[in-house]
Each structure stands twice: as C-alpha cells, then as structure tokens.
A protein has these predicted regions:
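Short, charge-rich amphipathic segments
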Residues: 1-10, 26-39, 78-81, 104-115, ...
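Conserved acidic/glycine
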Residues: 1-67, 261-263, 268-332
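N-terminal start-of-chain detector that recognizes signal peptides
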Residues: 6-8, 18, 28-32, 53-54, ...
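Cofactor-binding active-site loop characterized by glycine-rich and histidine/acidic residues
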Residues: 43, 47, 51-183, 201-207, ...
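Glycine-rich ThDP/TPP pyrophosphate-binding loop and its adjacent helix/strand module
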Residues: 129-328
Length: 332
C-alpha cells in the first residue's frame, strides 16, 4: 500500500497543543464545550451498552469529535446534512440535545426518531440533519440530490455528506462524486478517514491510504488535514463551504482521525475479534482533539483547568438527569 497520508497517519505524531493564533475566544470556548459534551454523551452510551441498558448496536465516535464540531460551525439550519452509521457527533454538533439522543438509543417515543430508529437512524430536519443510516454510503447520493434541490430552489444552502474510508469502496460514492462535479452541486463531502472499516485496516483494503485521490479523479477541490485539530478543521471547512456557497461546485475534505472504541459498542481494543495494537490506541489517544485545544487555550490564558472542571461537573449533572428521564420515558 502507498502511504500518501505521511505523518498524518503516524499515531506518534501531532500530540502537541494546536495553534489558536488569530482565533476568536468565544468560538474556541464553544468548540471545546461542544466536543466535551459529545464525548461525555458517548461515555454515557458506552456505559449503558456495557451494562445491558441499550439494545442493538451502538457505534461510538470518541476521538473524532473535532470533525463534526469544526464543520458545523459554518452550517445553517437550512443546510442539508446527511450522516452515516457513526453519527452521534454529526447530530449533536448541530443540536446539543443529548436527552433526545438518549431517548432514541433507548427506544423511547421522546427520541429524535420517536424511538423507532435507535443509534443509527437519527433524524432532526429542523436543525439541518436529514438522517443517518446503517447502510454504508447509503446517504451519499441523497445528499447530492438535496444539494441539487437547493440550487433549483435558488438558495445558497448546501448539502453535506459524511462518509468514512470504508464507504469510499462503494460504487455509489464514485457515482455521486461524478454527478456532483458535472452538475456543480453545492455539496461538501466529508471523509472521516479513521483508517479502519469495521475491523479491517485500510492497508488491507485499498492500494493507497489517501481517500481524497477519488476527489482528484473527479476534479473536485479537496483538502487533506489532521482531523484531530478542531481549529484547522474549522478554518478549512470555512474556506471550502464559502466556495461551495458562491457557486463553485462541490468540495471534499479528508480528515485523518482514529476512533477510540472498536467498530461497535464500548470495547476499545478489539474489532469483531481482531485486536488492535494497544500501543497504537494509546498513541492515538494522545492526539485527543479535546486536550490539544484545552492545553492551547490554557497556555494562552483564555481558559483554565478550574473552568473546565466546572463545565464537566455541570454537564455530568445534566447528563445524569437526562439519562434518568429518558430511561423512564414510554416506549412507542
């Protein structure tokens, strides 16, 4: 396999605090708070799954929070965002209603999909989230169609399609890239390259580890970046989204990241019986997008450990209340 990602895929790299130069303090606090909220929400889901409170599969995205948070900073409620099977962060970054997510995953009628969808069938159109599905690459063509509809409706709304490196092996993705480029559809393709599709590393599935090569093949402007640097994600997304809204056609952003948990449920070191290197998992955890931003803000004296602890303590209280409420809600 050709290593085109270079140091981006090296788990021993990019452990240092990130650059926050010329960044708005309020935006930094907002992004940090959002990432912490998503992380803590998924910790609750992991606990619930481990202890038999949740039925059905739960795909957790801990370690990947910077991607959805950085991109959602530049989206409107009228944009059309489509997720995949690991989409808790995609939804929560648009609408931080973790109570409704808890209710949905627990199968309660107060959930985002009235308790009928669970973890992988999430829907929140009022906040721009048009759905997630368990079918790999199942929403990509829908996102292109929604983006084209925005053009027909003469709005500056855009479509957003979240896909993983595994989804890039599905034919519909390549058809969607081609159609979007030919029609100049206003859509952002977001490739979350966490190097694994289910339990299989990308080196066992593709001749190159750089998924954005497929964007190049379709003449789609692309950016390849560290997906665990929320400031770089935000800045890059802003540039691409501004171009898309101005009528320049589709864009693609590939973000190299790593999921801390296995493919499904709460275990951190195995994927369908295949053990990942414990050293790699620990090194990737040292590239934690939350701690990297937090350290940068503390170093810049715009944040403190005390403020972060207060934020987490208050969040823990609200999460516990929401979980208990959802547990006591009615089934549909």
């Amino acid at each position: 396999m050709k290593n085109k990602l270079g140091s981006l895929s090296d788990p021993k790299m990019f452990h240092e605090p990130i650059s926050i130069q010329n960044q708005d303090t309020d935006s930094l606090i907002e992004m940090l708070s959002s990432m912490i909220m998503i992380r803590k929400t998924e910790e609750h889901l992991a606990y619930g799954k481990k202890h038999g409170m949740i039925g059905g599969p739960v795909h957790l995205g801990a370690g990947q929070e910077a991607i959805a948070v950085g991109i959602s900073q530049h989206l409107n409620k009228t944009d059309r965002v489509f997720g995949a099977h690991r989409s808790h962060a995609h939804l929560l970054s648009l609408n931080p209603n973790f109570y409704k997510l808890f209710a949905e995953v627990l199968g309660k009628e107060t959930g985002f999909s009235k308790g009928m969808g669970g973890s992988m069938h999430l829907y929140d159109k009022p906040n721009g989230f048009y759905g997630s599905v368990p079918i790999v690459a199942g929403t990509v063509s829908l996102a292109v169609g929604a983006a084209m509809a925005a053009t027909f409706q003469k709005t500056d709304d855009i479509g957003v399609a979240y896909i993983g490196d595994g989804a890039a092996e599905e034919g519909v993705v390549h058809e969607s890239f081609n159609l979007a480029r030919m029609q100049k559809a206003p859509i952002l393709f977001v490739v979350e390259n966490n190097l694994f599709a289910s339990h299989m590393h990308i080196s066992l599935r593709q001749p190159s580890d750089m998924v954005s090569r497929f964007g190049i093949a379709n003449d789609i402007p692309y950016k390849l970046i560290d997906g665990n640097d929320v400031v770089e994600v935000s800045n890059t997304a802003r540039e691409l989204i501004n171009n898309i809204r101005s009528g320049k056609g589709p864009g693609l952003i590939e973000l190299v990241t790593y999921r801390w948990f296995g493919h499904v449920d709460w275990r951190d070191d195995i994927d369908v019986g295949v053990e990942r290197s414990k050293d790699d998992v620990q090194n990737w955890k040292a590239r934690d997008p939350i701690s990297r931003l937090s350290k940068s803000m503390i170093n810049a004296e715009i944040w403190s450990q005390d403020r972060e602890e207060e934020l987490i303590n208050n969040l823990d209280v609200e999460l516990a209340k929401s979980w208990e409420k959802a547990m006591n809600d009615s089934y549909p």
